Amino acid sequence: MAAAQPESRDGAAQSAKPASETDPLSRFTCPVCLEVFEKPVQVPCGHVFCSACLQECLKPKKPVCGVCRSALAPGVRAAELERQIESIETSCHGCRKDFVLSKIRAHVASCSKYQSYIMEGVKATTKDASLQQRNVPNRYTFPCPYCPEKNFDQEGLVEHCKLTHSTDTKSVVCPICASMPWGDPSYRSANFMEHIQRRHRFSYDTFVDYDVDEDDMINQVLQRSIIDQ
């Protein structure tokens, strides 16, 4: 199995993040679809997206980068990153077989054990529809789940936790997920630091329609997942 490669110029803004210390594959993960990059493209601000994901992000009249919120523009092919994706291996979380990163997306689309693994995660983080009656929560500022500090925006909470609580192993509720329509305010993440650095590197406001009911939202996510595969 190929070892992790030294930092490259392609995607350097992502690979330099501490998340790579807890998940060595994080620098090969698109911040939009959360899958291994497919035809990676580096935009002017330095972040990298799948080509198809970037095209979706560019559709608004004034597109912004979902990671840093700077103005978004078409980028250039991340050739070195693409080369590494063709050579580095990883294991399927379902069947545990090894594949090069470029093949893992196609594999998990048809792996029944991986689908079972994903559905268990969905059940753990999705509220029962019968329990959805509650007031619309504040989705703009969040408290730290580890300490009394509060009123962080999403990016501020990520940075605060990385700087202050990177070694804290306590299971906590993710305040960002708990505020979402599908969130479970009682679900405790076993590895919150890895979760927040991978799942919340971009702003949900850029991609999520909060007015869509949960069933429609889940269907949209599943359809997009199939298309991305």
Swiss-Prot record:
Chain intervals for the UniProt region annotation (Disordered): 1-23
Gene: Rnf114
Residue numbers bearing the N6-acetyllysine modification: 103, 113
Pathway: Protein modification; protein ubiquitination
Segments forming C2HC RNF-type zinc fingers: 92-111
CDD domains, per database record: RING-HC_RNF114 (cd16540)
Keyword Cytoplasm among record annotations: yes
Subunit-structure text: Interacts with XAF1, the interaction increases XAF1 stability and proapoptotic effects, and may regulate IFN signaling.
Record's comment on post-translational modification: Autoubiquitinated. Polyubiquitinated in the presence of E2 enzymes UBE2D1, UBE2D2 and UBE2D3, but only monoubiquitinated in the presence of UBE2E1.
Name of the featured protein: E3 ubiquitin-protein ligase RNF114
Pfam family, one: zf-RING_UBOX
EC number annotated for this UniProt entry: 2.3.2.27
Keywords tagged on the record: Acetylation, Cytoplasm, Developmental protein, Differentiation, Metal-binding, Nucleus, Spermatogenesis, Transferase, Ubl conjugation, Ubl conjugation pathway, Zinc, Zinc-finger
InterPro entries: Di19_Zn-bd, RNF114_RING-HC, RNF_E3_ubiq-protein_ligase, ZF_C2HC_RNF, Znf-RING_euk, Znf_C2H2_type, Znf_RING, Znf_RING/FYVE/PHD
An annotated GO cellular component: cytoplasm
GO-annotated molecular function: ubiquitin protein ligase activity; zinc ion binding
Reactions it catalyzes: S-ubiquitinyl-[E2 ubiquitin-conjugating enzyme]-L-cysteine + [acceptor protein]-L-lysine = [E2 ubiquitin-conjugating enzyme]-L-cysteine + N(6)-ubiquitinyl-[acceptor protein]-L-lysine
BP GO terms, sorted: cell differentiation; protein polyubiquitination; spermatogenesis; ubiquitin-dependent protein catabolic process
Predominant localisation class: cytoplasm
Binding-site residues for Zn(2+), renumbered to this chain: 92, 95, 107, 111
PROSITE patterns tied to this protein: ZF_C2HC_RNF, ZF_RING_1, ZF_RING_2
Chain's role: E3 ubiquitin-protein ligase that promotes the ubiquitination of various substrates. In turn, participates in the regulation of many biological processes including cell cycle, apoptosis, osteoclastogenesis as well as innate or adaptive immunity. Acts as negative regulator of NF-kappa-B-dependent transcription by promoting the ubiquitination and stabilization of the NF-kappa-B inhibitor TNFAIP3. May promote the ubiquitination of TRAF6 as well. Also acts as a negative regulator of T-cell activation.
Superkingdom as given in the UniProt entry: Eukaryota
